[in-house]
C-alpha cells in the first residue's frame, strides 16, 4: 500500500458523463475520486482501466443516463452559455 496526500479539487464535467461515473463508482463500491484516479493512472501507462464485464456495465449506464459522447468528442465540446 502506498501512502499519499489527496487534495480537494473542483472540476467541471459534462452532466451525463458524471452520472455514468457516479453510477460506475457505486457499482464498483469505490469513491468517485478513487475511480477517477484509477482511470487516470491506467491511461498514463497506456493501459485499459476496465475489463469486459465492467465495460458492459458502463454500456448499460451510458444507455440509462443518455450518454452519447464518445472519445471522438473529447477536447471538442462547447459549453452552452
Question: What role is predicted for each listed range?
Answer:
Residues 18-19, 34:
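A generic alpha-helix surface/boundary motif
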Residues 28-55, 67:
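Short, basic amphipathic alpha-helical segments that act as recognition/interaction helices
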Residues 1-15, 22-25, 62-72, 76-81:
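Short Lys/Arg-rich basic patches
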Amino acid at each position: 500500500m502506498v501512502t499519499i496526500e489527496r487534495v480537494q479539487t473542483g472540476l467541471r464535467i459534462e452532466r451525463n458523463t458524471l452520472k455514468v461515473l457516479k453510477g460506475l463508482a457505486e457499482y464498483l463500491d469505490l469513491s468517485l475520486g478513487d475511480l477517477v484516479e484509477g482511470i487516470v493512472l491506467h491511461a498514463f501507462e497506456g493501459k485499459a482501466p476496465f475489463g469486459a464485464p465492467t465495460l458492459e456495465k458502463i454500456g448499460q449506464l451510458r444507455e440509462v443516463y443518455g450518454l452519447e459522447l464518445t472519445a471522438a468528442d473529447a477536447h471538442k465540446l462547447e459549453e452552452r452559455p
